[in-house]
Amino acid sequence: MFAEIISIGDELLTGQKVNTNAGFICSELAGAGIPVQRIIACADNVDAIQEQFRESLERAMLVIVTGGLGPTRDDMTKQSAQQFLNRELVVDRQTYERTLDRYKLLGKKPVSSLCENAMVIGDSVVVQNDEGLAPGMIIACEERFQGHYLVLLPGVPREMKSMMRNSVLPYFSGLCGTVIVHSHIKTTGIGEASLAKIIVEIENTLPDGTSLAYLPHTAGVSLRVSSVGTDRSSVEHDNREITDAIVSAARHFVYATSDISLEELVGSLLLKEGVTIATAESCTGGLIAGRLTDVPGSSGYFEQGFVVYSNASKEKNLGVRRETIETCGAVSEEVAAEMAEGCLQRSGVHMAVSSTGIAGPDGGTELKPAGMVCLGLAIRKEGEGVRTETETFVTRGDRLQNKLRFSEAALRMVWKALRS
């Protein structure tokens, strides 16, 4: 079995949006042992959509379509498929009732398009949408393309991802008689090339049916280990063995083997250890505090945050000495240390983390380039006084990327301290 992907939407052809859905679907299907041979972008036009349906279904056993299932006039995918397959539209009661319940929960009056939203193509397998309203459909196209399937999914990435993982992949895995096991490995503080060097021997000796995907992003690199086969115990054994080997080889950089963020892990460790934290930020502008408080339950460990952008604010609000700023510069480990210590003293917490740097693109020098941040971490332990650590981190990116990476480095510093 191989697949084709059709991404529907004028916005994809005018450059208004980037087709991230196709990349995700390719990655998920590859992990399931289903190769993708073509990705096609198609306009919001019934004739164009139906012609593409015909071409793709003649070639591929599995055609996955995203976009065009919404309630607006330019959402033409469902109508195009219904006409193309010459089938009736029927109301899916489960979708209708789920949508009605959501309106009631939000205190909204049901709209006239509620019933239209719940219409699905006859004889299709309905894919429930846990993240939105429009249902998806898995359609066996036996009349014209025997053994071939057309899958319709919403174009909203969050909705599409949930439906792919929870419904579409399990359906076709069961159909093919295959077992698929995925493991996720989260790393921080290491780039893709460096990580590849550490695990090259493992990657070169992967067992048959097991693949490794590198998933780099702005803040770091994630890995996905995928194992495919017909015997569940063997598949699970191979997946676990490779995952354990990678975690062992890259243990200084691996922080999780689940789909968890660094801030979530740090939050759980803070709660577990009964440690409170505060932040003192300059170049990150509150991003570290924002990420910490993005986690539900963060009131159990987060006390407060200072955003001290100017030198005067650092002096006034955190007690950073002017002499230190004039001698060492605002972007220095010495200033980062005093920021963290001042934050610790004023907040009464167990731990305070600070950032001072140059987010760019301007403001850098040869000695202190744009993309450089100095971090401080002040830790108070009963009977031991205050211990302060500092480090300097340099990255290359645009302003927003640099700020995100600075915040990642700060959270990584906190994680390492809690781990030790």
Swiss-Prot record:
InterPro entries: CinA, CinA-like_C, CinA_C, CinA_KH, Competence-induced_CinA, MoaB/Mog-like_dom_sf, MoaB/Mog_dom. Gene3D superfamilies: CinA-like (3.90.950.20), MoaB/Mog-like domain (3.40.980.10). Belongs to the CinA family. Pfam families: CinA, CinA_KH, MoCF_biosynth. SMART domains: MoCF_biosynth. NCBIfam families: cinA_nterm (TIGR00200), PncC_domain (TIGR00199), PRK00549.1 (NF001813). This is CinA-like protein.
